[in-house]
Curated annotation (Swiss-Prot):
Stretches for region Domain III: 144-195
Entry's localization field: Cytoplasm
Region Domain I: start-end pairs: 1-61
Native source organism of the sequence: Pediococcus pentosaceus (strain ATCC 25745 / CCUG 21536 / LMG 10740 / 183-1w)
Function: The RuvA-RuvB-RuvC complex processes Holliday junction (HJ) DNA during genetic recombination and DNA repair, while the RuvA-RuvB complex plays an important role in the rescue of blocked DNA replication forks via replication fork reversal (RFR). RuvA specifically binds to HJ cruciform DNA, conferring on it an open structure. The RuvB hexamer acts as an ATP-dependent pump, pulling dsDNA into and through the RuvAB complex. HJ branch migration allows RuvC to scan DNA until it finds its consensus sequence, where it cleaves and resolves the cruciform DNA.
Protein's recorded name: Holliday junction branch migration complex subunit RuvA
Amino acid sequence: MYEYLDGVVVNVNPAYIVVDVNGVGFLVNVANPYSFELDAKQKVFVHQAVSENDQTLYGFKKAEDKELFLNLLKVKGIGPKSALAILANDDHTGLINAINNDDVSYLKKFPKIGPKAAQQIILDLKGKVAVENEVGTLFDLSTTSNQALDEALEALIALGYSEKEVKKLTKKLSEQTDRTTDQYISSGLKLLMKG
């Protein structure tokens, strides 16, 4: 499996791009091909889908886009083409908010997504996807510019706590000064356990 391709985009078509990596051209299906700069060296994050008859690369400008694509693939009834179409037609913040807020009508606007598929997306992904910049925005709103605290909050989210739970801790933890990341994590876990 490939994580990314680092090469020159030599061809841009309506459904795909071609990335030249050391003389080998990789055809990569992407959501928005014209967002890639032609004849420029770029890193394209990829997912390789292998089936009985085919091997296909799906590409993304950012690792977060790839992660959201992979989450969509986990939904029963959503294949790579549908997931790519969803990513092509939306800003990720709106999509993630719709998933986390049970907004079926918002999800039905995507190609080939009916009420059942929309409900399945919500059922399978609610609480499992986060707004890409929500964590960064959360920390920017903090009253301190404390790197150890920021890292601790990110770690708590990585441990599986929701954005809302962690956001509630920010003020309490920011009142504690001169602490290491580990100490903030420990304090955060204690506060989360208290409920």
